[in-house]
């Protein structure tokens, strides 16, 4: 069973999510619904990593940038990390080198891979999920048909 905020998105919002993965991620209800779906599939580490990277890229302070980079690395990248994401060895090594001198782009390659994985794998499953279908069904039931 999925649960998101008690405040539901409008039917129109829910339908927009199927148009593009970016639409889903840009909408707070869409993001919450997608996170709940990923959690139900035991793969929420992907969206959590992606969101951590988005936050990381907005960080201005060099000290905070370094501490956030270490946290992201420890949480998602290093071997046996609690929320280890599924990326190739080469990308992991590149990140390990990149965080020696932290820049806003040190996780870019991994973030792109995770985004692509979610867009091509998790997103289509989300759109076919009972939860999303139920939102769409409610959408159809709320439409007034004029003859």
Task: State where each predicted segment sits.
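Long, compositionally biased intrinsically disordered regulatory segments in eukaryotic proteins
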Residues: 1-147
